[in-house]
């Protein structure tokens, strides 16, 4: 059952504020192409106000209200937010499905992870105080040294539309746990649940200015946030092209950044596997979240001895995927997020065909859906490594298949990419899986599966997929600075210079 879209303003300094220029952006339901609401559009002027609010929150009461408060104080707020997310889970999931086209079952799963992420970082916030003043072993007895971990300050968090609330919370939860104050700028294509997070923060009494939520276009809100002198760090998830612009802006002030960018991840299937199990993982690894996954294993490498039979199974499994309005029960593939993305993906498929690839299955709009940005699950064969479809991130339900003859060839093909976010191998040979895991040029490796993600484990890439790690203890470290404190403990003078006495 549908749910009305709330009408919200920007969330700044603990209250709703109309954008200074009073601009708004329509919300389009990607399943129907209908306008179902709107969101506020922040501009440079609003960014200034939000940054000032975050800086005040950081230093209020000499930092004792937030940045220097005991970790248990921050943990209390994070747990309260988690409880409210659980309370509102059904409505949040429905809003997410309407806003970005994610199947409702997936959106519900995401909300469970959102609450779990806040709870996990509440525990880490609580444990942070006990880790302060960690001693450092020194070679000289006349000195003692210890380490302080302190919040970086005001952080700008720029997040994508494929996991609108979850990937925002991957940044919000650890940054607040660390004692930072934050300005969240979600994608203009899917911001609704991030504004609902702001409402939850208001409900639980989060101190004003600790979290500010600015919706709007990247050029009008994201860019001024990245370059703002009052922001101490930028954490970004999005495309390589936009990420490089964010880095350039941050570099002018030597501002630290962490980047989770695009991917073109490989999945290698050997000839010793259960073909049906492997086929399901291959499709899940590419078609989950409507194919809009930065870590999607969209380059499938199949051992030549099983290729024909395996590809046949892929097609059979693909035909069994329910493509529908994401609110329908049992939907497993919804629409892509926008008309622009829809047209971009179809252009990728068209170019692949013109370059000589075979569109074995899918490649167009499903016949039973006249409206909405729907694309059939698409399987492409006869691909060469020089083709655009093999080398560039599509960000849609498009799986490319190549064969290999040997383990060495599979590794070479897998690593032949500018990207290095995820990689997967399916084989019953444990030693082979270990060898390939070490050989993969990627930040995340899956064995006999694809795409599972846990709050406790690090997430991030290498090469053009970015740097820095989110989630786990590594996610908290993203928002902490390390300070060395060294004490001279001897009563004797230092004695380097000759005393005038």
From Swiss-Prot:
UniProt keyword annotation of Oxidoreductase present: yes
Tissue expression per record: Widely expressed.
Lineage: Eukaryota, Viridiplantae, Streptophyta, Embryophyta, Tracheophyta
Pathway: Amine and polyamine biosynthesis; betaine biosynthesis via choline pathway; betaine from betaine aldehyde: step 1/1
Enzyme class: oxidoreductase
Species per Swiss-Prot/TrEMBL record: Arabidopsis thaliana (Mouse-ear cress)
Subcellular location: Cytoplasm; Plastid, Chloroplast
Pfam families: Aldedh (PF00171)
EC numbers, comma separated: 1.2.1.-, 1.2.1.47, 1.2.1.19, 1.2.1.8
SUPFAM superfamilies per record: ALDH-like
Phenotype on disruption: No visible phenotype under normal growth conditions. Mutant seedlings exhibit increased sensitivity to salt stress. Mutant seedling exhibit increased sensitivity to drought stress.
Name of this chain's protein: Aminoaldehyde dehydrogenase ALDH10A8, chloroplastic
pH dependence (record): Optimum pH is 10.75 with 4-aminobutanal as substrate. Optimum pH is 10.5 with 3-aminopropanal as substrate.
Binding site residues for NAD(+): 238-245, 294, 393
Family: Belongs to the aldehyde dehydrogenase family.
InterPro entries: Ald_DH/histidinol_DH (IPR016161), Ald_DH_C (IPR016163), Ald_DH_CS_CYS (IPR016160), Ald_DH_CS_GLU (IPR029510), Ald_DH_N (IPR016162), Aldehyde_DH_dom (IPR015590)
Highest rank taxon of the organism: Eukaryota
Presence of the UniProt keyword Acyltransferase in the record: no
UniProt keywords, alphabetically: Chloroplast, Cytoplasm, Metal-binding, NAD, Oxidoreductase, Plastid, Sodium
Regions annotated as coiled coil: none
